[in-house]
């Protein structure tokens, strides 16, 4: 027969109360994290709504012009993702970020992370490097410096320049941007034409 809460030992009541408090705290923490995460993502997103035709045309002059422009890089990355081959540009971006590290103590862990992700035999996003460059980069991991990925990054840049960059310039990801009528270009008196690229270049993170 149920005797109700009054019939339970004091220790059980304290345990139940403590458990309820913990569950309530965890639920509040979960809601708080989700709310914070959604705001964080919104803060990091920069929408590329307008890119001038002059800028878009410069992207066809060189791969360097393309990937050094925030929206150009986003468009190229979207193209590579559509081909399931974004590991090369991801590696290039990681190398650029690595070279900006100021603290010597942070070089080694970051270098190992890049190596394990893109260069090692069991890399999750292995890039296509020749054996000599791969071995040289492996040796550089013994004492990582700010330049330890320079040769590998150069090889991957050249590979993209000869292959995926040329395909990108022939793809709708680029051609639609060069056609003002296809991505909502607007011409105002005294202003240069620009393309609304929201649908083609959704985000420049």
UniProtKB/Swiss-Prot annotation:
Q: One short Pfam family name for this protein?
A: RGS
Q: Which organism is it from?
A: Rattus norvegicus (Rat)
Q: Where is the lipid attached (S-palmitoyl cysteine)?
A: 2, 12, 95
Which SMART domains has this protein been placed in?
RGS
Q: Does the keyword Magnesium apply?
A: no
Cross-referenced InterPro entries = RGS, RGS_RGS4, RGS_sf, RGS_subdom1/3, RGS_subdomain_2
**What's the name of the protein?**
Regulator of G-protein signaling 4
Q: SUPFAM superfamilies, alphabetically?
A: Regulator of G-protein signaling, RGS (SSF48097)
Give GO terms for biological process. dorsal root ganglion development; negative regulation of cell growth involved in cardiac muscle cell development; negative regulation of dopamine receptor signaling pathway; negative regulation of G protein-coupled receptor signaling pathway; negative regulation of glycine import across plasma membrane; negative regulation of potassium ion transmembrane transport; positive regulation of excitatory postsynaptic potential; positive regulation of heart rate
Highest taxon above the source species: Eukaryota
């Amino acid at each position: 027969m149920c005797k109700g809460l009054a019939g339970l030992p004091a220790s059980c009541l304290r345990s139940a109360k403590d458990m309820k408090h913990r569950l309530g705290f965890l639920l509040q923490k979960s809601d708080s994290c989700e709310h914070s995460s959604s705001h964080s993502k919104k803060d990091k997103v920069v929408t590329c709504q307008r890119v001038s035709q002059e800028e878009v045309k410069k992207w066809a002059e060189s791969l360097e012009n393309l990937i050094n422009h925030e929206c150009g890089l986003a468009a190229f990355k979207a193209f590579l993702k559509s081909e399931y081959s974004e590991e090369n540009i991801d590696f290039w971006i990681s190398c650029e970020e690595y070279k900006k590290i100021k603290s010597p103590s942070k070089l080694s862990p970051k270098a190992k992370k890049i190596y394990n992700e893109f260069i090692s035999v069991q890399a999750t996003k292995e890039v296509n490097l020749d054996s000599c460059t791969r071995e040289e980069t492996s040796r550089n991991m013994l004492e990582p410096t700010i330049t330890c990925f320079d040769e590998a990054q150069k090889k991957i840049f050249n590979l993209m320049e000869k292959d995926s960059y040329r395909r990108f310039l022939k793809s709708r990801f680029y051609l639609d941007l060069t056609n003002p009528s296809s991505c909502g270009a607007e011409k105002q008196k005294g202003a240069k034409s620009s393309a609304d690229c929201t649908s083609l270049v959704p985000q420049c993170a």
